[in-house]
């Protein structure tokens, strides 16, 4: 089988979903901006050679409906010969898009693909139109459809305290703010027009969601958001609602060498896994272990990790059971995570992979893992290797 490589990876700035910079920008525009941007940044790639676009999106309705992948590619003015499909594995949608496209390249069904994902949670809320079948209650706890309560359950099972959660959330904002100030996001963010608080058109260059003013005292004062009587999970220790998109240009190693392109990373292995929906946030643990086994690697072989921070109460048990608690500061989410940057559902998989690859380049890391939990009890993971 062919080796699959990433030659470029970018994202939009992350905008707040409530009255944020992208409140007048549609999801198709966020997506099209990155599709065009990838081709503009890589003039050696003939767009007519691109086989397919795989685009993650969870709420596929309203402006995100009717195959947003195809709508965005047409909006971007890409050749009409490029096919496009929209992928949904809930929170792992754009990482699943990466996996699907990679498999197509591995078996020779494509040479070049664009992958990515988008979610405009300000325009299409995550619970829009959700209608669970009542029969699910025979096999799954009702609370399994309430992500915050699953985080509460997982945190309690693993003895994660409110103080630990607040400290984790505080660190996420501090790391993300420091990364912004020091320019560590500059190589992955493709600036995009949005609107400031006065409604004026502005070029958005940085993430809007990060709250550098966050303090431990402020976090401690927040009330539990999901279990008012006995809970520990607050809005401050949960991933922020945000709007954004991310994208990658991937191809076979042979094609990259033929075109004289710099290979930024190679796919070593991929995995998905299921777990009890009541503790959906635990999914990264079995998925990561499975991906590492397929790559012939151990957890100690990995230099850097990007773990999507759905909730602090969810992230910390995963870090503990992967044996990474003692190296958390050195190896995990060096630039913060979704608690600070937000979690635009369909965007996040390729967003964390993009951030991981940029951090691997910056630090000289050889091996990295991007992994995330998925609503209703799944996990997904990808092992990357730099040349």
Swiss-Prot record:
Pathway assigned in UniProt: Lipid metabolism; fatty acid beta-oxidation
Cysteine pairings via disulfide bonds: none
GO molecular function per UniProt: acetyl-CoA C-acyltransferase activity
GO biological process, one term: phenylacetate catabolic process
EC number: 2.3.1.16
Main location: cytoplasm
Entry-linked HAMAP family: FadA
Protein's recorded name: 3-ketoacyl-CoA thiolase
Species the sequence originates in: Aliivibrio salmonicida (strain LFI1238) (Vibrio salmonicida (strain LFI1238))
């Amino acid at each position: 089988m062919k080796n699959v490589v990433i030659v470029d990876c970018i994202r939009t700035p992350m905008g707040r979903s409530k009255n944020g910079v992208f409140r007048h920008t549609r999801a198709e525009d966020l997506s099209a901006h990155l599709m065009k941007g990838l081709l503009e940044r890589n003039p050696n790639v003939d767009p007519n050679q691109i086989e397919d676009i795989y685009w993650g999106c969870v709420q596929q309705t309203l402006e995100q409906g009717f195959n947003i992948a195809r709508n965005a590619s047409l909006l971007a003015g890409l050749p009409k010969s490029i096919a496009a499909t929209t992928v949904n594995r809930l929170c792992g949608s754009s990482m699943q898009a990466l996996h699907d496209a990679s498999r197509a390249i591995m078996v020779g069904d494509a040479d070049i693909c664009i992958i990515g994902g988008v979610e405009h949670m300000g325009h299409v809320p995550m619970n829009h139109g959700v209608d669970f079948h009542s029969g699910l209650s025979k096999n799954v706890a009702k609370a399994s459809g309430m992500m915050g309560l699953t985080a509460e359950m997982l945190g309690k099972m693993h003895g994660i305290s409110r103080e630990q959660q607040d400290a984790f959330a505080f660190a996420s904002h501090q790391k993300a703010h420091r990364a912004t100030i020091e320019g560590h996001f500059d190589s992955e963010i493709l600036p995009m027009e949005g609107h400031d608080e006065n409604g004026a058109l502005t070029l958005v260059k940085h993430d809007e969601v990060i709250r550098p003013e966050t303090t431990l005292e402020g976090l401690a004062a927040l009330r539990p958001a999901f279990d008012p009587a006995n809970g520990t999970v607050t809005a401050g220790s949960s991933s922020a609602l945000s709007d954004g998109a991310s994208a990658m240009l991937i191809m076979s190693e042979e094609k990259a060498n033929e075109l004289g392109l710099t290979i930024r990373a190679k796919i070593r292995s991929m995995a998905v896994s299921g777990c009890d929906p009541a503790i959906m946030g635990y999914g990264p643990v079995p998925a990561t272990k499975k991906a590492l086994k397929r790559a012939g690697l151990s957890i100690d072989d990995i230099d850097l990790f990007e773990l999507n921070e759905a909730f602090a109460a969810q992230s910390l048990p995963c870090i503990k059971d992967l044996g990474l608690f003692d190296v958390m500061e050195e190896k995990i989410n060096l630039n913060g995570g979704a608690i600070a940057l937000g979690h635009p559902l369909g965007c996040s998989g390729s967003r964390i992979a993009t951030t991981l690859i940029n951090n691997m380049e910056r630090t000289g890391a050889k091996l990295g893992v991007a992994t995330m939990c998925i609503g209703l009890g799944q996990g997904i993971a990808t092992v990357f290797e730099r040349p």
